A protein has these predicted regions:
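Short, glycine-rich, amphipathic interfacial segments at transmembrane boundaries or analogous
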Residues: 43-85, 143-161
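Hydrophobic structural segments characteristic of membrane proteins
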Residues: 102-209
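ATP-binding N-terminal substructure of ATP-dependent carboxylate-amine bond-forming enzymes
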Residues: 208-311, 342, 539, 566-580, ...
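Glycine-rich active-site loop/lid that clamps phosphate-bearing ligands
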Residues: 537-571
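A hydrophobic, helix-centered structural microdomain
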Residues: 1-65, 172, 177-209
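Internal nucleotide-binding/catalytic subdomain
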Residues: 371-482, 491
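A conserved helix-loop-beta module that forms one wall/lid of the active-site cleft
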Residues: 300-370, 375
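Active-site "cap" helix and flanking loop/linker of ATP-utilizing ligase/carboxylase catalytic domains
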Residues: 451-473, 479, 488-547
Length: 616
């Protein structure tokens, strides 16, 4: 009679009393839990109920949001005294058992009892021995026989045996004993935590979490292949890494330990919100212009190291960049900013009348997107439309085309001093798109020319306002001397700074950028003097049938990496911008010439085979 009727009556009575007690406790505790990490107040989880039926159990949340699951060798949940997953308020809630109070809601609903076996997670259902499963005939309880007498001092096997004993001996006297024993146990604070000293695996996991808890947090804007080196390096350094990207399937999100935030990197208000939520210590991006204004805004809002907003605008808008460089007397080509076809036609005529060729590009894009050289017989309006297609705000740059060797300069600014780390020779497709198809370090230009290149690059950095962090400056060496093509206040792409600079100088530029973002001193000491090079595969337009020779390329002299960006079955164009390239080879050598030869020989072994009839 007690088991099937009076026990439920007592549950309802105590459930109502518990609910009355819960309301003022909730009013006091809920804000503290929420403002600890702005997560939910209640922890809701599926548990095994009577007869194995699952239900949702409620508790006050005592762990940080997104805390990993750590299990002991017996499969039970890790519950060490120094568990780094538990919040400060959570320790108090657990010690006083206040975290269990919301389960009075479960008692009133009817899927729990005041006293009964403590419920387990769903994955335990198949672990119960047949002779123990008898405890499933009883409703799980807020407290129970094992909880009252042993709390967390016994392992899962002993706990199940105690629960089985209770299920076969349910009675009013036993419940009264358990009730008062629970009160005594809670007041004495005995066995709040389980002794986990003998479980090495669980201890190791907890130690890792403690290290993460004390580690700095860096936010990396972008989680694509471009930002992957920074994500990997930051994780290797033991940092907490928050990766932000609008693509939920971004490759950087697949790295173990990354905190994933699916947000557009140019949505400044939302990114700032994410930065505050994770209490970041630094923010950066890698080889991408689009997030630079966001980096500047986040740095300003949180008082972090980074470029200022004015510098970010100058570094991401070619028109503003040209104006700043011109004002500072830095050598640049003749240029005009235009917003419509009438202004465009007028600008083209002016540059041609100066005896120069004309190149057209969007003011606010990168990666050779929208860039086009006007030939003598080409229709200028086609070039305008092509550039406008890639312009976000509609502004187009009409410039003098500069003949001459093209290089890029990789720098790191520390405390206002711009340090040139390497000069890179560049190979492009030429007219009309000028997409880069190869890079070699160090530059093979003469020493005097390289010194002049360094001088112009440093002047450009100062004109833009870069006082801390990396830059990638592209320069044409004209008959009149080096002139700026453009400058990015970030690391160069195409593996120049992530792979080639470390191979040729021993300087880890990604590590340097992470250090600077966190307010630490980077190591820019040159450790070696070698050559490095990257070469992109030759390709035709069409659907890729197969890519031959990859293994042969990997086994070639000096090859460090062979990568494919577009695979079998994908439709590709000729190389019209950086995103259209199929793949590349990276190699090194004792000299720049040797590295270039190694990369070229390996790249020639790769054949991108196009289906002659993709519908066949």
């Amino acid at each position: 009679m007690y088991r099937h009727f009076f026990k439920r009556v007592l549950d309802i009575l105590f459930g109502l009393i518990g609910l009355v007690v819960l309301i003022p406790v909730f009013i006091v505790v809920a804000p503290i839990i929420f403002f600890t990490d702005r997560g939910p107040v209640l922890y809701k989880s599926k548990r095994i109920g009577r007869n194995g039926k699952l239900y949702t159990m409620y508790k006050f949340r005592s762990m940080y949001v997104d805390s990993p699951d750590i299990r002991l060798e017996d499969g039970s949940t890790y519950n060490g005294e120094d568990d780094p997953r538990v919040t400060p308020i959570g320790r108090f809630l657990r010690k006083t058992s206040i975290d269990e109070f919301p389960q009075f809601i479960n008692v009133l609903i009817g899927n729990m009892s005041l006293i009964g076996p403590r419920p387990d997670p769903p994955d335990w259902l198949d672990r119960y021995p047949d002779d123990i499963k008898v405890f499933l005939t009883a409703k799980p309880g807020i407290t129970g026989y094992s909880q009252a007498y042993y709390r967390n001092s016994v392992d899962s096997t002993e706990k199940m045996k105690n629960d089985a004993y209770y299920a076969t001996h349910i009675s009013f006297p036993l419940d009264v004993k358990i009730f008062f024993k629970t009160i005594a146990c809670v007041l004495s604070h005995e066995n709040v935590y389980r002794d986990t000293s003998g479980d090495e695996k669980a201890r190791e996991e907890a130690d890792k979490l403690r290290a993460k808890e004390n580690a700095k947090t860096i936010m990396i804007l972008g989680a694509s292949i471009l930002q992957l080196p920074a994500i990997k390096k930051a994780l290797e350094d033991g940092l907490n890494v928050v990766a932000v990207d609008m693509n939920p399937d971004a490759i950087g999100f697949k790295e173990d330990g990354v905190i994933k935030e699916v947000v557009s990197t140019i949505d400044i208000p939302k990114v700032i919100e994410v930065a505050k939520k994770h209490k970041i210590d630094g923010v950066m991006t890698l080889a991408s212009d689009m997030p630079m204004r966001t980096v500047a805004a986040v740095s300003k809002e949180l008082g972090l190291v980074g470029i200022d907003e004015d510098t970010a605008v100058k570094a991401t808008d070619k028109a503003c960049m040209r104006d700043a460089l011109k004002a500072a007397g830095v050598p640049i080509p003749l240029y005009y900013r235009v917003k419509n076809k009438d202004e465009f036609t007028d600008a083209v005529d002016k540059i041609k009348s100066a005896g120069c060729k004309v190149i057209v590009k969007p003011a606010d894009n990168s990666g050779s997107r929208g860039v086009n050289l006007l030939s003598d017989d080409s229709d200028p309006s086609v070039a305008y439309d092509y550039a406008a297609e890639y312009s976000r705000d509609g502004e187009i740059l009409v410039e003098e085309f500069m003949d001459g060797a093209e290089v890029s300069v990789e720098t790191i600014a520390v405390n206002g001093e711009v340090n040139v780390l390497q000069i890179t020779d560049k190979i492009t497709t030429g007219a009309p798109y000028f997409v880069e198809t190869g890079h070699t370090q160090p530059s093979r230009l003469d020493a005097a020319t390289k010194e002049e290149i360094k001088r112009v690059a440093i002047a450009a950095n100062k004109a833009i306002g870069i006082k801390s962090g990396p830059s990638h400056t592209e320069i044409k060496v004209t008959k009149g001397g080096p002139k700026i093509v453009e400058l990015g206040a970030r690391l160069g792409g195409d593996c120049i700074t992530t792979h080639l600079v470390p191979l040729s100088t021993g300087i880890d530029m990604v590590e340097c950028c992470i250090k600077i973002a966190l307010g630490e001193s980077p190591d820019i000491t040159v450790k070696c003097d070698r050559g490095s090079a990257i070469r992109y595969f030759e390709q035709e337009a069409g659907v890729i049938e197969k890519i031959d020779g990859l293994d042969d390329a990997e086994e070639s002299d000096g090859v460090k990496q062979v990568s494919v960006v577009h695979g079998v079955g994908e439709e590709v164009t000729e190389i019209v911008n950086s995103a259209s390239r199929v793949g590349f080879v990276i190699a090194d050598g004792a000299t720049a010439d040797e590295a270039a030869t190694n990369a070229e020989n390996a790249a020639k072994k790769v054949k991108v085979v196009i289906w002659k009839d993709k519908n066949a």
